[in-house]
A protein has these predicted regions:
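Short, flexible helix-adjacent loops and helix caps
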Residues: 39-46, 70, 74, 127, ...
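Histidine-centered active-site/metal-ligand motif
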Residues: 57, 81-83, 124-125
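Charge-enriched, short contiguous segments at helix-coil
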Residues: 98-152
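Non-transmembrane, amphipathic alpha-helical segments
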Residues: 18, 22, 46-54, 103-107, ...
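Short runs of predominantly hydrophobic/aromatic residues within well-ordered alpha helices
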Residues: 54-58, 62, 85, 108, ...
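Charged alpha-helical initiation segments
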Residues: 1-51
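Short, charged amphipathic alpha-helical segments flanked by flexible coils
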Residues: 71-106
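Short, hydrophobic, well-ordered secondary-structure elements
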Residues: 48-73
Length: 152
């Protein structure tokens, strides 16, 4: 993810927040997480750890970004046990509020398969590190998925 893409997302997010200060604070957190993906190489020297941190920061940005979207649309799950990527994606494909378009089921499944499963594999499993090929696929997939969600 490059600076240009992050800057574009920042513009989209601030327009989406429409002056709501609480949502703008969340959007700052999302942007900071996405910016940390690029900054990881300056802060972390070990290449395997760099790749792991990229997965961590990109998915934290996505997680908070989906929470922001669902909050703005009045469709955030009420139970804390449902505040995670898998539940957010499920909610997007079955909106309760009717204030946004339904995420098509094949796109929800692709997000589960291409983002959530990889995140869980590497963030929750000791000794596992993604390779460069996965990073080169996963990070753009995360960014593209979030931009898609903002357009629902």
């Amino acid at each position: 993810m490059g600076k240009k893409i992050t800057d574009t997302l920042a513009i989209q997010l601030f327009a989406f927040c429409d002056g709501d200060m609480a949502l703008e604070a969340m959007s700052n957190d999302v942007i900071e997480e996405f910016e940390r993906v690029e900054g990881t190489e300056r802060m972390v020297k070990d290449p395997a750890s760099q790749r792991l941190y990229k997965v961590l920061h990109a998915t934290r940005g996505l997680d908070t970004g989906l929470e922001l979207f669902l909050t703005k649309k009045g469709d955030l799950p009420t139970e804390m046990k449902n505040h995670h990527l898998r539940a957010y994606i499920a909610r997007l494909s079955n909106p309760q509020s009717g204030t946004y378009s339904k995420l098509k089921s094949h796109l929800a499944q692709a997000a589960q398969d291409n983002i959530v499963i990889h995140r869980n594999r590497y963030v929750h499993k000791a000794g596992k590190f993604p390779d460069n090929n996965l990073i080169n696929q996963l990070i753009p997939d995360i960014f593209a998925f979030y931009q898609l969600v903002l357009g629902l």
